[in-house]
Curated annotation (Swiss-Prot):
[4Fe-4S] cluster binds at residues 345, 348, 351, 391. The gene is nuoF. NAD(+) binds at residues 54-63. SMART domains: NADH_4Fe-4S (SM00928). This is NADH-quinone oxidoreductase subunit F. Its EC number is 7.1.1.-. Keywords: 4Fe-4S, Flavoprotein, FMN, Iron, Iron-sulfur, Metal-binding, NAD, Quinone, Translocase. It comes from Rickettsia bellii (strain OSU 85-389).
Length: 417
């Protein structure tokens, strides 16, 4: 369990004001100039040494990602912060935007400096109206105080940060679709290569990072990479915000050490499963895009990238969705299928046609109107979609169904009979 003094997001639940004066009292903007004066290479090396992995779902090394940016480029470089949080069961970034805006803005400055970007864009989900207002207010405060803009923090480095509001499309959370949207085009993922580090926003070198990945950077640089690396497990270091929802007594967002047992985080922070642990049916451990885990696997699962991969799921965004024995699990997954069908951009045939087909079959399984042979057919189609699309939305639509068939096939078959 994370010690109180190791928490990074001390105002995660909004117990104090989030204005600049209050944020400074909590340690934000504390001698940021000294961190900038240590140089780009030092910042990137510290982030690498800390073992910070992307908190948006993919889990790629943040420091390594930054090092892909060209050292010398005739074109301008950009930092883009992905605040288009739309994954069902996930609301961690929303609380950072709402209650810890200055951590994010300071992180934007340090990350922009490290990759040589003089402009940073925060792309925020369209529905996050109040959060966008908070970020804009915090940006105005930071500009007024000379913390960003020309000669940011008196360091001689110029950094402008812009807030861009999306229009509510889930697909724009995919980094290249986000860039297309930011350029004023329809949000459709791009083919890779070229990768954003070489050809990103407006055809210029670009790094795209998640809100949480950027917001933890100032604290890592202040407290040291070794401090961050000492929390959690090897290759799964540091703290992470987990969102616990569903059939628990106290749904919450909580910052915890990576690698905390799934059972422990639910019982210590969310008041346990409704009706007790024995009433548990299954848990989706990382937001709606990852395969569910039945109760037997939840007993031993740890909340980190490698442990959940070994259990046949993924950490994803850290959105823990708890389902007790009252859940119609087939309908719950069918509901997710409908979401992915609705949010597919339609660019790739397997996803465009497959998501709708999967949802229709799932609804027949819910009603018990299907044949047993259709279960295998459905599984086969999920495997044909997986890995055959430009972006990962096809995979995200396939995995929940694969998890359902793997762990609850008996329930599907008994309903058909």
């Amino acid at each position: 369990m994370l010690k109180k003094e190791d928490r990074i997001f001390t105002n995660l639940h909004g117990e104090q004001s989030h204005d600049l004066k209050s944020s400074k009292k909590l340690g934000d903007w504390d001698n940021t100039k000294a961190l900038l004066n240590k140089g780009k290479e030092w910042i990137i090396e510290e982030v690498k040494k800390s073992g910070l992995r992307g908190r948006g779902g993919a889990g790629f090394s943040t420091g390594t990602k930054w090092s892909f940016m060209p050292k010398e480029s005739k074109k301008p470089s950009y930092l883009v912060v992905n605040a288009d949080e739309s994954e069902p069961g996930t609301c961690k970034d929303r609380d950072i935007l709402r209650y810890e805006p200055h951590k994010l803005i300071e992180g934007c400055l340090l990350a922009s400096f490290a990759i040589g970007a003089n402009s940073c864009y925060i792309y925020i989900r369209g529905e996050f109206y109040n959060e966008a207002s908070n970020i804009q207010r915090a940006l105005d405060e930071a500009y007024k105080d000379g913390l960003i803009g020309k000669n940011a923090c008196g360091s001689g480095f110029n950094c402008d940060i812009y807030l861009h509001r999306g229009a509510g499309a889930y697909i724009c959370g995919e980094e290249t679709a986000l860039l297309e949207s930011l350029e004023g085009k329809k949000g459709m993922p791009r083919l890779k290569p070229p990768f954003p580090a070489g050809f990103g926003l407006y055809g210029c070198p670009t790094t795209i990072n998640n809100v949480e990945s950027i917001a933890v950077v100032p604290t890592i640089l202040r407290r040291g990479a070794s401090w961050f690396a000492s929390i959690g497990k090897p290759n799964n270091t540091g703290t992470k915000i987990f969102c616990i929802s569903g059939h628990v007594n106290k749904p919450c967002n909580v910052e915890e050490a990576m690698g905390i047992p799934l059972k422990e985080i639910i019982e210590k922070h969310a008041g346990g499963v409704r009706g007790g642990w024995d009433n548990l049916k299954a848990i989706i451990p990382g937001g709606s895009s990852v395969p569910l885990l039945p109760k037997s696997l939840c007993e031993t699962a740890d909340m980190d990238f490698d442990s959940l991969k070994a259990a046949g799921s993924s950490l994803g965004t850290g959105g823990i969705i708890v389902m007790d024995k009252s859940t119609d699990i087939i309908y719950a997954i069918a509901r997710l299928s409908k979401f992915y069908m609705h949010e597919s951009c339609g660019q790739c045939t397997p996803c465009r046609e497959g998501t709708g087909w999967m949802w229709r079959v799932m609804m027949r399984l819910v009603k018990g109107d299907a044949k047993k042979s259709e279960i295998d057919q459905l599984l086969e189609v999920t495997k044909e979609i997986e890995g055959h699309t430009i972006c990962a939305l096809g995979d995200a639509a396939a995995w929940p169904i694969q998890g359902l068939i793997k762990h609850f096939r008996n329930e599907i078959e008994s309903r058909i009979q």
